[in-house]
Amino acid sequence: MSDFYRSFRDEIAAGGAVDDGTTGSTPQGRAVGVVMLALLVLLAVRSPWTFVFVVGLLVSVFLHEVGHFWTARRTGMKATQFFMGFGPRVFSFRRGETEYGVRALPLGAFVRIIGMNNLDDVEPEDEPRAYRGKSYPRRLLVITAGSLMHMVIAFVLFFGVYVTAGGDHATGRAVVRGMLEGSPAWNAGIRSGNEIISVGGVEVGSYDSVVAAIGAHSPGDTVTVVFDDGTSRRRAEVTLSESTSRPGRAFLGVVADDTEEKRFGPVEATGRSIGDIGGTMADSVSGVFTVLNPLNSWRQLTDEDAPVENRPTTVVGMSQIGGEVGESRGLAGVLQLLAYVNVFVGMFNMFPLLPFDGGHAAIATYERLRSRPGRPYRADAGKMIPVATAVVGLLLILFVTGLYLDIVRPIG
């Protein structure tokens, strides 16, 4: 067995770098660290909102590991390493039994807990503090703490935005926000800021209801549109034209808005935050399977019309989106985007295969189901390494695909 594969196997199974007993830094780590720091400074100067988003991602990753570390310590497990980043050490120091530090590549973070499985050698005196020797509830708490922390982060961000900056609130009114000059609505005297009351005798209170009322007619039909121009209600006879983008469909020529920004109180903000998290979790479940599907990656590479919401992306693409959101919506928009990203990452991380946390949770659950009183069952992690290797290979393909698309066909 090669040294590279042995190291790869041990680190995949252990959930982090194998402790070699050294601290400090390496020349390679210092060099790469200086380059990374310079790039962050350059990013802060050239695109402040992108920098804010990237810092938010790094803080989220750090808090993910804090979740693992804190629960491990509270449940009596021994954590020997807590690192931000991967690759060569930039610097590290040891406090007590734990080495803390930063590594050169800011691609994630890890906490090293001893005895994650049967492949992890543990000193006899440390065996009572090994992960594998703890009860199933304690192991499950520690391994899911990272994803739970993402949900806490998302809630705090959603809640903070709703009570300070506010969010969209349904008004029950369809107010014109956009017009196409020369359209049937324009010719009838309807202008931006007017409120549409009814179309063809059907009362409307949202943009969707306006679309539905128009869709009930055919091109060439004349309908009565009642609207409020701010001073009085007016009635206009409008002859609908044909949509150029959807042949055969009637066209009025307005874009209406049925929401407005509103600050929410703590109770309503709590409800909306929980609802946003629940909805994003549901979307993330289907999204994970879509993103992990190699056929989806192939379609994204070969078809420029493939749905952009299904494409794999990297921190490069997400940072581009974060910068654009910051330019248009400011800090509140960036924080909301970070909240959605945290929910997705939390769900993605629970995919039940190594090297995800969900893989460790699945192993712990399998061991619990196979165990009998007085006869604890321990799974052979070595048999799972080929599957974990395939997952890592798939993730590498997704990363390369996402990075290529982020550079060649940036979102937005």
What are these regions (language model features)?
Residues 185-208, 277:
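Conserved PDZ fold ligand-binding element
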Residues 40-41, 384-406:
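Final/C-terminal transmembrane alpha-helix of multipass membrane proteins
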Residues 5-29, 129-130, 134, 244-345, ...:
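Functional transmembrane alpha-helices
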Residues 191, 197-198, 211-255:
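PDZ-domain C-terminal substructure recognizer with occasional recognition of PDZ-binding tails
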Residues 2-16, 48-125, 341, 348-370:
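Small-residue-rich helix-interface/hinge motifs
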Residues 30-76, 310-336, 412:
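Long, highly hydrophobic alpha-helical transmembrane signal-anchor segments
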Residues 1-51, 400:
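Transmembrane alpha-helices
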Residues 74, 107-175, 386-390:
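Internal alpha-helical transmembrane segments
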